[in-house]
Amino acid sequence: MDASSQYSALPYPQPPRVPSAAPSAGRLPWSRVGEIVIFTFVSVLALYLLWLWVLKDCILLLKAQRGRSTEELIFGPGERPPVASADGSRPVPDPSPPVRRDLDLSRV
């Protein structure tokens, strides 16, 4: 037997094969999962900011156009109906102090 035919000068008869990518197992790659998570986060943030800056004001505006002012929507009705007394004689007026509209703030 000839020793030169059995052994070559190179350690490997052929260069080793290096796989270009891992075989797919039918699942999403991690980069795609990361893209989906980032897209979901940005979408939720955009919807929250849209609600905070635009949609809430539009709803208040539509309710105010139906006859109620925005102050009534936020703070409740401006005037309360009188409360009936326990003995039924006459209604008791609202205990809150009246608003003074005669103050002139231009002299301050």
Swiss-Prot record:
Entry superkingdom: Viruses
Residue ranges crossing the lipid bilayer per the database entry: 35-55
UniProt keyword list: Host membrane, Membrane, Transmembrane, Transmembrane helix, Transport, Viral movement protein
Region (Disordered): 1-25, 73-108
Chain intervals with Basic and acidic residues compositional bias: 99-108
Pfam families: Gemini_mov
Record's subcellular location: Host membrane
Assigned GO CC terms: host cell membrane; membrane
Record has Transmembrane helix as a keyword: yes
Any one of the GO BP annotations: transport of virus in host, cell to cell
Record has Signal as a keyword: no
Bilayer topology term: Single-pass membrane protein
Family under the similarity heading: Belongs to the mastrevirus movement protein family.
Description of how the protein assembles with itself and partners: Interacts with the capsid protein (CP). Part of a MP-CP-viral DNA complex.
Described function: Involved in the viral transport within, and between cells.
Protein name: Movement protein
